[in-house]
A protein has these predicted regions:
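Short intracellular "coupling" helices and adjacent cytoplasmic loop segments at the cytosolic face
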Residues: 13-23, 119, 127-151, 155-157, ...
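Transmembrane helices of ABC transporter permease
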Residues: 41, 45-58, 62, 99, ...
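Juxtamembrane helix-loop junctions of ABC transporter transmembrane domains
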Residues: 20-28, 52, 59-75, 99-146, ...
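ABC-type nucleotide-binding domain
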Residues: 82, 365-642
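Membrane-integrated ABC transporters
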Residues: 1-60, 75-96, 110-114, 118, ...
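An intracellular "coupling" helix at the cytosolic face of ABC transporter transmembrane type-1 domains
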Residues: 40-43, 138-139, 157-164, 168, ...
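Helix-loop-helix
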Residues: 77, 184-198, 268, 272-343, ...
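Hydrophobic alpha-helical transmembrane segments of ABC transporter permease domains
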Residues: 32, 51, 106, 110, ...
Length: 642
């Protein structure tokens, strides 16, 4: 049956390919939010990491500065001695080795701690993402390709891993190194420092030009990757349909177009990114060579007291200065890419949760000595609506399963109403069947009962209570639902049945399977109820999956059943077995049924005929046949869509 949902609108080209290049908005705000997530849980770790980064940077600077002393005070004097004493030199080299050892230990500690910080932060982000995802309304998943959502969990989160574990620590280290080296160079020789800074200005100008181009392509790369993942996921789910209609070549063409789009954006992004390091490295080499020539000339000419040790120490500092500038350029691209991923992550996390203003809850209840309903912690088989009032009092109303629609209008989007003035009721124990052409609104009505969507106008009452006053989790707990698309989870058969009520015993699950007439085929499985199901129950037939879905609804023991296409995928023999089981399951419960075959709803207490979102007929099977209206045409004509 068609679902009357808002369609996802994409940009030009397949699935939005070819639209304008996006830009990261508020990068500073995004970075602040990311670091807020890190500091919230790992502030002490970050302080230690910062200390290690400073220690490592200072060790490198000190080693470079000590080179002046090593050359001028040890090596040069030894060249003028006939029998030089190597002991002082070895002591000096040992001192240099200790300085480098401190730097190595600090860098190792920094790396180890950042692994813990990074993985812990990503774990927390994934938990927040998944927790928030479960609070999102159904319409969010209708409007966003599932593969694109998966891409947020995988690709976008991975860009944050690179940024947190490598880019930001390296950026901080580079900044500290640049400042400390600059001060040291100024102390050694201000003239060579000016020469170095002129070359650095050229490096920064070049880097800015390159990163300004690469940033927009990194954002596009993440977007195109999400679209490709969405397409792959969609085609994997629809492989049977693709093969039935022999659309492999068409599907491949769509994949190639999206894949080529990703290739282009990734090529452009990485072309700019990959050129940064070689360009800055070569400019750094030029800076090194110029400083070496100028310094050597000054030392040979004894200009300003320049010594060989000063030149060598300055060249070491020059190398230490140019390297972090090159790294800053590279890490800037990585951070831009990570911010593009972070923007998608936080966009999903900031999507509005499913609104729920309900305050009426469902509780276990029992009758006291005065025959009044009271709340209890024990499972008694009696459920009651707990209704708090403004005056501070609380009343309990037994859950019966009475559903009433009064003047209900609804549209998936505000400008298009798909249900018009729906008035109907289902009393406890009644079976209400919805029939009509595809797109008439049958599935939409059941979506409104469980509040997957909220109505635009009118009222839906459950046991006399406006369902908008009932907390959604409690409302849905009172409903047993067999969805149009049967979905089973990876796990055993028993676990899938128990999904209907997690505290159900094995005996209750088996009883539910028997009620749904699923026990027979389950017993014939290799491991019976302990048989492992593969992805979405792929190792079961369509009918067997449907039977398990019915058993899953049965174990919940709900007062209201919603059976959306419950027997549409079951053969005639299996349908007869299921129908007998369902008749027993529906006894004493309000049941709303949609079925392909009108023969399955002949025994309904009320059949509601829908057309273009309006109720055009209602009554029992015999009454509607006697009217010889739309239902009569559907029933006797055996129309394909029904």
């Amino acid at each position: 049956m068609a679902q009357e949902k808002a369609k996802v609108v994409h940009g030009p080209g397949p699935r939005g390919v070819g639209g304008p290049r996006p830009k990261v908005e508020n990068p500073g705000k995004l970075l602040k939010r990311i670091m807020g997530e890190v500091f919230r849980h790992y502030l002490p770790h970050c302080i230690i990491v910062l200390f290690c980064i400073v220690a490592s940077a200072m060790a490198n600077v000190q080693a470079s500065l000590f080179l002046q002393t090593l050359v001028d005070d040890y090596i040069v004097p030894m060249t003028q001695q006939a029998n030089p004493d190597f002991a002082p030199l070895l002591g000096a080299l040992l001192k240099v080795g200790c300085i480098y050892l401190v730097g190595i230990i600090a860098a190792w500690c920094n790396s180890r701690i950042m692994v813990n910080v990074t993985q812990g932060t990503l774990r927390n982000l994934r938990v927040q993402l998944f927790t928030h995802m479960e609070s999102l309304p159904i319409k969010y998943f209708d409007q966003h390709p599932h593969g694109d959502i998966m891409s947020v969990y995988t690709n976008d989160v991975d860009t944050l891993r690179q940024m947190l574990s490598q880019s930001i620590p390296q950026l901080i280290s580079s900044a500290i190194t640049i400042v400390s080296v600059f001060v040291s160079m100024c102390v050694l020789d201000i003239r060579l420092t000016v020469v170095t800074m002129l070359m650095v200005a050229l490096m920064l100008f070049t880097t800015k030009k390159i990163t300004s181009q690469s940033g927009k392509y990194f954002i596009a790369q993440q977007r195109d990757l999400g679209k490709l993942n969405g397409y792959i996921e969609e085609m994997m789910e629809g492989q049977k349909v693709v093969k039935v209609f022999t659309h492999e070549q068409k599907t491949l063409a769509g994949f190639r177009e999206l894949n080529d789009k990703l290739k282009d954006s990734a090529k452009q992004a990485n072309s700019y990114a990959n050129i940064i390091m070689p360009v800055t490295a070569q400019l750094g080499n030029v800076s090194y060579a110029v400083c070496a020539l100028v310094g050597a000339a000054m030392a040979v000419g004894n200009v300003g007291g320049m010594t060989l040790g000063t030149v060598m120490a300055f060249l070491a500092l020059n190398k230490s200065f140019n390297m972090p500038i090159s790294q800053v350029s590279m890490q800037a691209n990585s951070i831009i890419m990570a911010l593009a991923g972070a923007e998608r992550i936080f966009k999903m996390m900031d999507a509005p949760s499913e609104a729920d203003e309900g305050y009426v809850t469902l509780v276990n209840a029992k009758y006291d000595r005065d025959d009044n309903l009271v709340e209890t912690e024990e499972r008694t088989g009696i459920w009651a609506w707990k209704h708090p009032h403004h005056d501070g009092t609380t009343t309990y109303h037994k859950l019966a399963g009475d559903i009433t629609f009064t003047g209900v209008d609804f549209g998936y989007v505000p400008e298009k109403t798909v249900l018009h003035d729906i008035n109907l009721y289902g009393r406890p124990g009644q079976k209400i069947a919805f029939v009509g052409s595809t797109g008439a609104g049958k599935t939409t009505i059941t979506n409104l009962i469980n509040r997957f969507y909220d109505i635009s106008d009118g009222k839906i009452r459950y046991d006399g209570i406006n369902i908008q006053k009932i907390r959604k989790s409690d409302l849905r707990r009172s409903l047993g639902i067999v969805l149009q698309d049967t979905h089973l989870f990876t796990g055993t058969v028993m676990e899938n049945i128990r999904y209907g009520r997690l505290d159900a015993s094995d005996e209750e699950c088996i009883a539910a399977a028997k009620l749904a007439n699923a026990n027979g085929f389950i017993q014939r499985l290799p491991d019976g109820y302990n048989t492992m199901l593969t992805g979405d129950g792929a190792n079961l037939s369509q009918g067997q999956r449907q039977l398990l879905a019915i058993a899953r609804a049965a174990v919940a023991d709900p007062p209201v059943l919603i059976l959306d296409e419950a027997t549409s995928s079951i053969d005639t023999r299996t349908e007869a077995l299921v129908q007998r089981g369902m008749d027993g399951l529906m006894y004493g419960r309000t049941s709303f049924v949609i079925a392909h075959r009108l023969s399955t709803v002949r025994n309904a207490d009320c059949i509601v005929v829908l057309e273009q979102g309006r109720i055009i007929e209602r009554g029992s099977h015999d009454e509607l046949i006697a009217k010889k209206g739309k239902y009569y045409q559907l029933y006797t004509g055996n129309l394909a869509e029904n």
